[in-house]
């Protein structure tokens, strides 16, 4: 398992130059319950509609949603749809937009009519002119793209065959990127992969790959065999074939093919899922990820995207929830720092009629004695809060050589235990302030204490709570473990 948080932080430091066919996506949702008396066609009773940035613009949105910066260059007409797109893009944080206008063509617009009940697309209406851009517009696009290469860590070309990525534009951008040492990721539309020659990675879907290679490759082995000629033709590092529910297969120029299965999810809408895949792939590769890490990120992002309605983008937080094991995330969510958050969690439990318990300690090296106390404490309540001494607090109590593990490591170990429901780090020598905040119904302490010696007993008893003392498990102590380790190391 790769470190998602480290990779996510690296992604946030990247800038992706994204170029491609911009579209305005509109989704009209409604119910269908009858057939038109005028013609054998269903009648949709419209309930709502949504406007989204589509095409390469959705790729840019996905890049920004991951936390990376995006420089986006696209082509629009001189019409209302262009104004809508410009306004929508201006509202997107993390995207620097450069739009080239061509008054001779309409802004590409797609309207999809969707059955709300069945989440099924019934009809799509397109406004577009798919002809290649004129020579003048090509030059304006090149002039907008090439000077911005220096600010990018990677280049992403999203080709929907609507006229932006002509052979001339592709050649100028790819060649300039290679001279600048920048990798180029291409989501291709043309079956002639040679026009993308020199790109780093091509990402066709299964249909596009079959058309480009004139093959019916189905298995991983067949895809790998068919991809070799295509890799040579396009002079690229690798080809990634996306295969919907079958997952995705990457074939590198050198080395074995890598197949990553799809996540099992309920598919609500596939619109824009390919945009999500290529955006995540580019951002993760820019951040220094290897092939397999990038593919696993892209596969998880696709699963999130298809579970949403409409043209979807995927945030870093959503991706994190999909990739990290539930147990890891559940443990992580137990560690809370701020008083406000602690109080909100505790009050929430209390409002449900749950009995809140509290215990505390340094828990420097977790051992069976600790586990006994924690388990007994949890058995005495419905939710257990563990107060954990901070590093500075441990050092004052135990000496300069302690703690052995820092407070974050100690908190993570505690949070992984089923008996523990919340871990709160305190900086004082005693947990009295934390006990006053939590006001537990049960205060548990292990060791040779009397009730009067337990810090916070007055607070708990004044509120009608009880103090429970747990016998220590003899032969187990952190100090003894540390001393033994040091003597063995001499």
Curated annotation (Swiss-Prot):
Sorted keywords for this record are: ATP-binding, Carbohydrate metabolism, Kinase, Multifunctional enzyme, Nucleotide-binding, Nucleotidyltransferase, Transferase
Known pathway: Nucleotide-sugar biosynthesis; ADP-L-glycero-beta-D-manno-heptose biosynthesis; ADP-L-glycero-beta-D-manno-heptose from D-glycero-beta-D-manno-heptose 7-phosphate: step 1/4; Nucleotide-sugar biosynthesis; ADP-L-glycero-beta-D-manno-heptose biosynthesis; ADP-L-glycero-beta-D-manno-heptose from D-glycero-beta-D-manno-heptose 7-phosphate: step 3/4
Q: Which reaction does it catalyse?
A: D-glycero-beta-D-manno-heptose 7-phosphate + ATP = D-glycero-beta-D-manno-heptose 1,7-bisphosphate + ADP + H(+); D-glycero-beta-D-manno-heptose 1-phosphate + ATP + H(+) = ADP-D-glycero-beta-D-manno-heptose + diphosphate
- Please indicate if the UniProt record lists Cell cycle as a keyword: no
Which annotated residues bind ATP?
Answer: 205-208
Q: What function does this protein fulfil?
A: Catalyzes the ADP transfer from ATP to D-glycero-beta-D-manno-heptose 1-phosphate, yielding ADP-D-glycero-beta-D-manno-heptose.
State the oligomer form and interacting partners.
Answer: Homodimer.
Family the UniProt entry places it in = In the N-terminal section; belongs to the carbohydrate kinase PfkB family. In the C-terminal section; belongs to the cytidylyltransferase family.
Q: What is this protein called?
A: Bifunctional protein HldE
Per the UniProt entry, what species is this protein from, by scientific name? Bradyrhizobium sp. (strain BTAi1 / ATCC BAA-1182)
| UniProt lineage | Bacteria, Pseudomonadati, Pseudomonadota, Alphaproteobacteria, Hyphomicrobiales
């Amino acid at each position: 398992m790769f470190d998602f948080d480290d990779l996510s932080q690296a992604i946030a430091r990247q800038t992706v130059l994204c170029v491609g066919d911009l579209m305005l996506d509109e989704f009209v949702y409604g119910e269908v319950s009858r057939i038109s008396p005028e013609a054998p066609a269903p009648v949709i009773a419209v309930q709502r509609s949504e406007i989204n940035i589509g095409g390469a613009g959705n790729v840019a949105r996905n890049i920004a949603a991951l936390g990376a910066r995006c420089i986006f260059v696209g082509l629009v007409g001189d019409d209302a749809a262009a104004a809508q797109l410009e306004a929508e893009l201006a509202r997107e944080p993390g995207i620097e937009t450069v739009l080239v206008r061509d008054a001779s063509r309409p802004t590409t617009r797609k309207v999809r009519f969707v059955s709300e009940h069945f989440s099924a697309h019934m009809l799509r209406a397109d406004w577009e002119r798919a002809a290649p851009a004129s020579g003048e517009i090509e030059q304006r696009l090149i002039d907008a793209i090439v000077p911005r290469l220096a600010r990018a860590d990677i280049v992403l070309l999203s080709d929907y065959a609507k006229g932006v990525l002509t052979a001339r534009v592709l050649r100028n951008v790819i060649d300039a990127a290679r001279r600048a040492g920048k990798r180029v990721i291409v989501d291709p539309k043309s079956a002639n992969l040679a026009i993308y020659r020199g790109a780093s990675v091509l990402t066709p879907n299964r249909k596009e790959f079959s058309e480009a290679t004139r093959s019916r490759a189905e298995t991983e082995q067949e895809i790998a065999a068919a991809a070799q000629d295509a890799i040579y033709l396009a002079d690229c590092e690798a080809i990634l074939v996306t295969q919907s529910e079958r997952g995705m297969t990457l074939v590198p120029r050198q080395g074995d093919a890598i197949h990553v299965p799809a996540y099992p999810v309920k598919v609500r809408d596939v619109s824009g899922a390919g945009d999500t895949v290529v955006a995540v792939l580019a951002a993760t590769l820019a951040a220094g990820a290897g092939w397999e890490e990038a593919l696993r990120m892209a596969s998880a992002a696709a699963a999130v995207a298809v579970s949403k309605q409409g043209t979807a983008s995927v945030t870093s937080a959503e991706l994190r929830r999909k990739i990290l094991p539930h147990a890891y995330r559940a443990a992580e969510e137990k560690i809370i720092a701020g008083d406000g958050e602690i109080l909100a969690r505790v009050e929430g439990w209390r409002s449900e009629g749950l009995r809140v318990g509290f215990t505390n300690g340094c828990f420097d090296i977790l051992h069976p004695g600790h586990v006994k106390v924690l388990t007994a404490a949890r058995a005495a309540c419905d939710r257990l809060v563990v107060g954990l001494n901070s590093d500075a607090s441990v050092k004052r109590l135990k000496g300069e050589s302690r703690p052995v593990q820092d407070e974050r490591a100690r908190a993570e170990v505690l949070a992984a235990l089923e008996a523990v429901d919340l871990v709160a780090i305190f900086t004082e020598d005693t947990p009295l302030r934390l006990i006053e905040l939590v006001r537990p119904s049960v205060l548990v302490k292990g060791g040779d204490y009397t009730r009067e010696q337990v810090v916070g007993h007055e607070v708990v008893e004044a509120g009608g709570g009880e103090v429970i003392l747990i016998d220590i498990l003899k032969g187990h102590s952190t100090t003894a473990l540390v001393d033994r380790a040091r003597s063995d190391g001499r």
